UniProtKB/Swiss-Prot annotation:
It is found in: Cytoplasm. It comes from Lactococcus lactis subsp. cremoris (strain MG1363). The gene is ung. Keywords: Cytoplasm, DNA damage, DNA repair, Hydrolase. NCBIfam families: PRK05254.1-1 (NF003588), PRK05254.1-2 (NF003589), PRK05254.1-5 (NF003592), ung (TIGR00628). This is Uracil-DNA glycosylase. PANTHER family: URACIL-DNA GLYCOSYLASE. Excises uracil residues from the DNA which can arise as a result of misincorporation of dUMP residues by DNA polymerase or due to deamination of cytosine. Signal peptide: none annotated. The active site is at 62 (proton acceptor).
Amino acid sequence: MKKTDWSQPLRNRLAEGYFPKMIEFINQTYQEGKIYPPENQIFRAIELTPLAQTKVIIVGQDPYPQPGKAQGLAFSYPATFKVNRPDSIVNIQKELREEGFSKEDSDLTAWAEQGVLLLNAVLTVPEFASNAHAGKIWEPLTDEIIKIASDDERPKVFILWGGFARKKAKLIDGSKHLILEAAHPSPLSASRGFFGSHPFSKTNDFLVQTGQSPIDWSK
């Protein structure tokens, strides 16, 4: 993990033995099998989006388990893959168009660089084994990231899609921040509350109201 302004707050909050256990888990799992994302991208979300620049947090579940597709950013998918994009990112693009934003590629790096923390609750996954690392090591870390963002004085937007992410609402101070909850953008649930929820325009409205620059969701 590269040193960022997330580093010290995390070390202050997590149990003393957590980081050695985390390093042991990373070393062991990456030696034993095919794990995604690449090891140097595990912490890419907090490396690309410092706490001081974080304005929006989108919570995902875990990385894409297919080769070459996980980028260390929730929901982001390499632009080099032009076909067979995950249905969730396709539905996110549909909602963006509905809200007047044109986002043709599926790589969300530019969002991260604007202050959108794209945080998976579980940061690694074995090949073709979605959610297999849930409950292993990552949730104490990612829960603390959410709490640190909530405790920060600048108002933020927390976007929680689906039942899994919505459970994280209890970690957030709703009196200070905007919490946007909706159905997950997967095909199973997108038509039951994700489409038409307007998370992107609502986010920008809140940012402007709190004296912050809006996100260019088209990037």
